[in-house]
Amino acid sequence: MREIVHIQAGQCGNQIGAKFWQVISDEHGVDPTGTYKGDSDLQLERINVYYNEATGGRYVPRAVLIDLEPGTMDAVRAGPFGQLFRPDNFVFGQTGAGNNWAKGHYTEGAELIDSVLDVVRNEAESCDCLQGFQMTHSLGGGTGSGMGTLLIAKLREEYPDRVMMTFSVCPSPKVSDTVVEPYNATLSVHQIVENTDESFVLDNEALYDICFRTLKLTTPTYGDLNHLVCVCMSGVTSSLRFPGQLNCDLRKVAVNLIPFPRLHFFMVGFAPLTSRGSQQYRALTVPELTQQCFDAKNMMCAADPRHGRFLTASCMFRGRMSTKEVDEQMLNVQTKNSSYFVEWIPNNIKASVCDIPPKGLKMSSTFVGNSTAIQEMFKRVGEQFTAMYKRKAFLHWYTGEGMDDMEFTEAESNMNDLVSEYQQYQEASADDEADEFDEEEGDEE
């Protein structure tokens, strides 16, 4: 019941995805061969959200793995949980997209897309009542961004009434993997604004910061970063997979967090994040979790929520706790930091409580916020885009695949519109008069 089909595209998407299935399998007591080795009926009660039960009681992930080159797939297949996936669900090309959005979206990716859609259709048909799709991908590369957005557009046509959610790794301000990131990201955002229901924005730099500052890791690897992403992904879907006192599903998250259809880019955070050495010195309480998950240092995207205001937010708690306490804390956060929440949406925090904590913790909370501060990220990418596009730098790689200049201009203006929409709602007040107070407050930050 209420199944989710998981799609991972490109290198980044597949690496996060592989880690995600480790985390989920761990929570549900499924071992790397797909056999159930858990100790509690609760693990099996709704295991079919993410798993198909095959013959002989084997649990197979509802996952579709796509890439335009075989490398990452082979690594996933050789990895610890590689034998878990259905071999037919690995769909890959041989050429690679070479960090080129146009290759992923128009040429190489377009050739592969039909076989991907067949596999996705196959997964969707084996569902009782498909709730939606979740995709992990990056926006800076070629396959995850180009082919990922192509697939999103195609699925949108075919399943218009199902939730489409993405976990998108955006280019970070200081750490850049690719010179043409701004192009790829802007072209992707152009698609994502129109075709997805909810996008969780992550970025490597913020994840590195969490690893350094909070987890006190001296040399964080991509494995550590991906693990952080996965705890969030697991938290967002926990109340679908385990019984809870206050449930939420993908649709509820969307309804409660998106006041205007285009503004569906969320920041995510997770608590408790403590370094390995200092865990035993901290009490895990609901106030502590709430305080930590609203903390700017815990946001997994390089935009500071203190520079904007929250339109809406949602806290998903896991573990045994009193719902009364959760409600009190939510109210507390809103009254204490009222200037960080727009006043024209009263009670704009949604809470949910799921009884089963993640492995190794007594309780945890996942934070999802729709903050106007996320415009910082779009603004930054947009500026880099404009700087390169002004000089038509690197453009021949894209036009060579049949793209038109117009598409770039459109994507650029769509991104700028998005930024100004966020800005407009950040400044709006309940009585809709230009509040001088608000403007001054914005300058002080």
From Swiss-Prot:
Mg(2+) binds at residue 69. One of its GO terms (biological process) is microtubule-based process. Residues 417-445 are annotated as: Disordered. Its cofactor is Mg(2+). Pfam families: Tubulin, Tubulin_C. It is found in: Cytoplasm, Cytoskeleton. GTP binds at residues 11, 69, 138, 142-144, 204, 226. It comes from the Eukaryota. One of its GO terms (molecular function) is GTP binding. Residues 429-445 have a biased composition (Acidic residues). The keyword Metal-binding applies. InterPro entries: Beta-tubulin_BS, Beta_tubulin, Tub_FtsZ_C, Tubulin, Tubulin/FtsZ-like_C, Tubulin/FtsZ_2-layer-sand-dom, Tubulin/FtsZ_GTPase_sf, Tubulin_C. One of its GO terms (cellular component) is cytoplasm. SMART domains: Tubulin (SM00864), Tubulin_C (SM00865). The keyword Cytoplasm applies. Residues 417-426 have a biased composition (Polar residues). Keywords: Cytoplasm, Cytoskeleton, GTP-binding, Magnesium, Metal-binding, Microtubule, Nucleotide-binding. PROSITE patterns: TUBULIN, TUBULIN_B_AUTOREG. Belongs to the tubulin family. Dimer of alpha and beta chains. A typical microtubule is a hollow water-filled tube with an outer diameter of 25 nm and an inner diameter of 15 nM. Alpha-beta heterodimers associate head-to-tail to form protofilaments running lengthwise along the microtubule wall with the beta-tubulin subunit facing the microtubule plus end conferring a structural polarity. Microtubules usually have 13 protofilaments but different protofilament numbers can be found in some organisms and specialized cells. Tubulin is the major constituent of microtubules, a cylinder consisting of laterally associated linear protofilaments composed of alpha- and beta-tubulin heterodimers. Microtubules grow by the addition of GTP-tubulin dimers to the microtubule end, where a stabilizing cap forms. Below the cap, tubulin dimers are in GDP-bound state, owing to GTPase activity of alpha-tubulin. This is Tubulin beta-3 chain. It comes from Oomycete-like sp. (strain MacKay2000). The gene is TUBB3.
